[in-house]
Swiss-Prot record:
Belongs to the PCNA family. SUPFAM superfamilies: DNA clamp. Monoubiquitinated by the ube2b-rad18 complex on Lys-164. Monoubiquitination at Lys-164 also takes place in undamaged proliferating cells, and is mediated by the dcx(dtl) complex, leading to enhance PCNA-dependent translesion DNA synthesis. It comes from Danio rerio (Zebrafish). This is Proliferating cell nuclear antigen. This protein is an auxiliary protein of DNA polymerase delta and is involved in the control of eukaryotic DNA replication by increasing the polymerase's processibility during elongation of the leading strand. PROSITE patterns: PCNA_1, PCNA_2. The gene is pcna.
Amino acid sequence: MFEARLVQGSILKKVLEALKDLITEACWDVSSSGISLQSMDSSHVSLVQLTLRSDGFDSYRCDRNLAMGVNLSSMSKILKCAGNEDIITLRAEDNADALALVFETLNQEKVSDYEMKLMDLDVEQLGIPEQEYSCVVKMPSGEFARICRDLSQIGDAVMISCAKDGVKFSASGELGTGNIKLSQTSNVDKEDEAVTIEMNEPVQLIFALNYLNFFTKATPLSKTVTLSMSADIPLVVEYKIADMGHVKYYLAPKIDEESS
């Protein structure tokens, strides 16, 4: 059987919030090393990859590998029934057609027990190659979310230009243009608030803002976000989940200015 217990259950609630608007259903691959998920969004433009390592759970048992087909909006609805302070346990038998979700208050005075039907999904696993990136920008996740939100008022695509000294986000539309430049921070006491840039060569790429705004739904999971870019390959937007894993979003650049 499979059983995973997470005292800080709010992490799981945040993970579902980060996924459910982008993908409707996905296969949760459960093994002794943890839980992983990989899925294209419904329009096959972006890819999301989630890893939750078993050692990040407070207790974890998986006797044999499972592939659980999950409707993410259903799971999100059930997780909304859990309080932010609740302990969450996920449980499934080896050949289960349902996933049990148990929510306990810290004082054990209230225990809620839900069962969610699983789906049969045919899933193709895409190999994601390990890449060296021309530019890797690490910045506060709230700042990135705000930039994407602000520039969405101007246009539907953002040009990200990365150089040694800073990164620039630009959008243009019928009402005009907007540019936001972040300089690399020279000395910051708090790592969470720093903007750091590792650059091998400058990069200038255009991305659809509506997808980036979907990705920023993961902001509550991490105080920082990492953007990895190279010409002609997908951007990677990564949110680390403390002591547990990460959620990574992949988005191919738009080909040229005229078509956007």
